[in-house]
UniProtKB/Swiss-Prot annotation:
Protein name: Probable potassium transport system protein Kup
Membrane topology (UniProt): Multi-pass membrane protein
GO molecular function, one term: symporter activity
CC annotations in GO: plasma membrane
UniProt family annotation: Belongs to the HAK/KUP transporter (TC 2.A.72) family.
Lineage start: Bacteria, Pseudomonadati, Pseudomonadota, Gammaproteobacteria, Pseudomonadales
PANTHER family membership: LOW AFFINITY POTASSIUM TRANSPORT SYSTEM PROTEIN KUP, OSMOTIC STRESS POTASSIUM TRANSPORTER
Reaction(s) this enzyme catalyzes, per UniProt: K(+)(in) + H(+)(in) = K(+)(out) + H(+)(out)
Length: 633
């Protein structure tokens, strides 16, 4: 994801050897799902589900975990979801843009798919708060077994680790990022080694690979069969990261890392924990740490903490990356994006997101105090995002790839059925703590839809009093104003209408520049726009030009740099001859039909606090003039 991914991948990604790419992918992509053994079986047998720690219960749960990993990750994500890349980019926003394109002119379907994408993105932010909290808490809880009386110190220690993690984000993790891969490879080797040790105690645990144990479990526990999926799904947390980080590593390195190292290590560890439980049911209080020899407990706690910090770093960086994509697709107000590396464009930091996540994580740790309590909140965010991803991929498979329905529909129905069951199993958890990601998701969904709709209404209101460009130019020919030297660039959302800033400037100053450029920035539903397709230029005469700049949702919108590509003899964009005119709209909530008054007030607040065009488009501060306009909505 974003920052962490590029730290591990580096600029030499395309030339890296397969083993190097595999190690890098393990360090970034698999941190979240790789730390799931810390708490999954612990939650299953201590989460109040009523599962007995006996032979049939243990084998039934292991069968559910094993076949969930096979179906959801090995089949659904590896074979289908990872193929749905948007010019190599993955993630819920990239997939939303791809699905929106697949829907074509079907407006209702487009709207439905966008809503699904925004729901998935909103839940991802909830996941971005829960993952660091539950991961670090579960790692530090190992100290309870190593030292008596340390229970009261678990929360403070976890908070210190988490706060330190958020504090270093602004400075980047370029140097330590190179250690992510080796540390996580070590982690998975330790997982596998501990698992082998446990399996040797009770080799019969391997029979849980037979799916009939899962069937027997449902038959023996008809009342809790579906509910237990709410705990089993914890083994799948982080599956979405496989898709989100595809743009940095590609599908093949991610798949190789999964099948060669990650899947075997996870299966061995889960089965090793299960084997230990067959011999010692009391170990269910913390099966991961009790699987290790007593002499290895402290080193294992240290390694677990490092692994959970790396997993948390990947999620935080993913939130930064997702936010940048959402900003450029028009779903989130512009924020200040800081680059933490001069070498890697993808290493970014967004302060508003970082501090919001930190506050959310601190509240979660203080409110829930243990990984077991947090587990109830975790599943809702994970399964909700997975379900939205499946819906979006379904649209891409049927409408964009044109897969024959006779082949695609059975696969998609199975995927939707499994995801739906996992999501349904987590719905009852909403009243047990799962309300947090749901409420966070609702708030973020309202913010994103309000911003998108508000911007649309704002453009419509500005257009109501707009003057068509041809009429304006004709009037200039009849009554030419005084012209001054230089180039004036007016940013406008509508390239065929006269910007309000231009009208205000002419009205108050009674002059026009020699060259007047009406500049429109358009964001496409693709990650990157080639330099050859970056701009369109039209000359209207009388020194007027229309320029349209095209950017992808991962491109860096550097307007002065992009304008240098406009090779037109009549245009001069030299820095000391170019002035940029911006319009700053102030929205006033009114009774005009559009949005509810409270949403209009919310949009006005968001617009007031959004980052302006000056910083976002990297305009030179000393060459910008900003003019204000009041708009009633």
């Amino acid at each position: 994801m974003g920052q962490a991914s590029n730290q591990a991948a580096g600029a030499e990604q395309s030339n890296a050897k397969p083993i190097g790419m595999l190690v890098a992918a393990v360090g970034v992509v698999y941190g979240d799902i790789g730390t799931s053994p810390l708490y999954t079986l612990k939650e299953v047998f201590n989460g109040g589900y009523g599962v007995q720690v006996n032979h049939d219960g243990v084998l039934g749960i292991l069968a559910l975990i094993f076949w969930s990993l096979i179906w959801v990750v090995s089949i659904k994500y590896m074979l289908f979801v990872l193929r749905a890349d948007n010019q190599g980019e993955g993630g819920i926003m990239a997939l939303t843009a791809l699905a929106r394109r697949a829907a074509g002119e079907r407006k209702k379907l487009r709207s439905f798919l966008v809503v699904c994408g925004l729901c998935g993105a909103a839940l991802f932010y909830g996941d971005s708060m829960i993952t660091p909290a539950i991961s670090v808490l579960s790692a530090v809880e190992g100290l309870e077994l190593a030292f008596d009386g340390l229970e009261k110190w678990v929360v403070p220690i976890a908070l210190v680790v988490l706060v330190a993690l958020f504090l270093i984000q602004k400075h980047g993790t370029d140097h330590i990022g190179k250690l992510f891969g080796p540390v996580m490879v070590t982690w998975f080797l330790v997982l596998g080694g501990l698992g082998v040790y446990g399996i040797t105690l009770h080799p019969e645990v391997l029979s849980a690979m037979n799916p009939m144990w899962a069937v027997r479990f449902f038959e023996a526990h008809p009342g809790i069969g579906v509910a237990i999926l709410g705990a089993v799904v914890l083994a799948l947390t982080g599956a979405e990261a496989l898709y989100a980080d595809m743009g940095h590593f590609g599908r093949k390195p991610i798949a190789r890392a999964w099948f060669i190292l990650v899947l075997p290590a996870l299966v061995l560890n889960y089965f090793g924990q299960g084997a230990m439980l067959l011999g010692d049911p009391e170990a269910a209080r913390n099966p991961f740490y009790l699987l290790a020899p007593s002499w290895a407990l402290i080193p294992l706690v240290v390694l677990s903490t490092l692994a959970t910090v790396i997993a948390s770093q990947a999620v935080i960086s993913g939130a930064f990356s997702l936010t940048r994509q959402a900003i450029q697709l028009g779903y989130i107000p512009r924020m200040h994006i800081q680059h933490t590396s001069s070498a890697e464009q993808g290493q970014i930091y967004i302060g508003a997101v970082n501090w919001s996540l930190m506050v959310g994580v601190i509240l979660l740790v203080l409110g829930f105090e243990s990984s077991n309590a947090l587990a109830s909140a975790y599943g809702v965010a994970v399964t909700g995002t997975m379900l939205m991803t499946t819906i979006l991929v379904s649209a891409v498979m049927l409408l964009l790839w044109k897969w024959p329905p006779v082949l695609a529909v059975p696969v998609l129905v199975c995927c939707l059925l499994v995801d739906g069951l996992y999501f349904a199993a987590n719905v009852p958890k909403i009243i047990q703590g799962g309300a947090f990601p749901v409420l966070a998701g609702i708030v973020l969904f309202v913010l994103m839809t309000t911003w998108k709709r508000g911007k649309q209404l704002l453009v419509e209101r500005l257009d109501e009093g707009g003057l068509p460009l041809p009429i304006f130019i004709s009037s200039i020919r009849v009554q030419p104003p005084h012209r001054v030297q230089g180039t004036a660039v007016f940013l406008t959302a509508r390239p065929d209408a006269v910007p309000h800033a231009l009208l205000h400037n002419l009205l108050h100053n009674q002059v026009l520049h020699e060259q007047v450029v009406l500049l429109t920035v358009v964001y496409e539903d693709i990650p990157r726009v080639p330099a050859a397709r970056r701009f369109e230029v039209d000359a209207y005469g009388e020194g007027f030009f229309r320029v349209i700049l095209h950017f992808g949702f991962t491109d860096e919108p550097d307007v002065p740099q992009a304008l240098k590509l406009c090779h037109l003899d009549e245009l001069d964009f030299s820095p000391m001859r170019t002035t940029y005119f911006l319009s700053r709209e102030t929205v006033i909530a009114s009774r005009i039909k559009g949005m509810a008054r409270w949403r209009e007030a919310l949009f006005a607040f968001m617009l007031k606090n959004a980052n302006g065009n000056l910083r976002f488009f990297k305009l030179p501060v000393n060459r910008v003039i900003e003019l204000g306009t009041q708009v009633e909505m």
